[in-house]
């Protein structure tokens, strides 16, 4: 499970983990999860994924809406939503988010699918979000809504629609640069400069 994966990584000495996924159709499942948990319409959160035509997008939105209505997911708890319309990828990523909190390892979220999993985790165990670092804000319309709901705001705005952990890995480089600046930059007192006051 995702929780066990994080535990294993902790035991091996890892201090930071990235999420990512690979698959076809998983923006459909993440849209359904998002719409259910945020109680919004399918059309508000369902985008083109890997590049659907207008006809394909309309069909995808209909599929999401039908699932929400058929299983009355707007009134369901997070676990029911996950088991009804979330895929194995979203379940595993949800476990990683929970595992990050359990084992005190920050988890760098990739895109919209990871963020949908993060919202499930936060709804199941409030406070999990404190261990999550969002990497990029993708092209899917659910991305902004998920960031707002989680109060986690991605720093990379590159209109990516890739998945597979690409945004999360890019975030590692930014984190390395930030840590380098933090660790190697001189302080005002070290260079005898009066500190700015606001």
Q: Where are the regions that the model predicts?
A:
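N-terminal loops that bind phosphate or other acidic moieties
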Residues: 1-198
């Amino acid at each position: 499970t995702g929780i066990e994966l994080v535990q294993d990584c902790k035991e091996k000495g890892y201090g930071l983990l990235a999420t990512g996924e690979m698959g076809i159709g998983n923006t459909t499942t993440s849209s359904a999860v998002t719409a259910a948990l945020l109680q919004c319409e399918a059309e508000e959160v369902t985008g083109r994924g890997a590049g659907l035509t207008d006809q394909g997008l309309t069909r995808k939105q209909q599929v999401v809406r039908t699932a929400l209505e058929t299983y009355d997911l707007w009134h369901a708890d997070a676990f029911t939503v996950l088991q009804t319309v979330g895929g194995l990828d979203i379940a595993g990523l949800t476990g990683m988010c929970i595992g990050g909190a359990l084992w005190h390892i920050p988890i760098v979220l990739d895109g919209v699918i990871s963020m949908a999993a993060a919202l499930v985790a936060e709804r199941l165990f409030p406070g999990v979000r404190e261990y999550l670092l969002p990497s990029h804000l993708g092209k899917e319309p659910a991305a902004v809504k998920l960031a707002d709901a989680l109060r986690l705001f991605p720093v990379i705005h590159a209109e990516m629609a890739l998945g597979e952990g690409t945004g999360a890995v890019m975030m590692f480089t930014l984190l390395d640069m930030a840590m380098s600046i933090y660790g190697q930059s001189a302080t005002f007192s070290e260079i005898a400069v009066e500190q700015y006051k606001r």
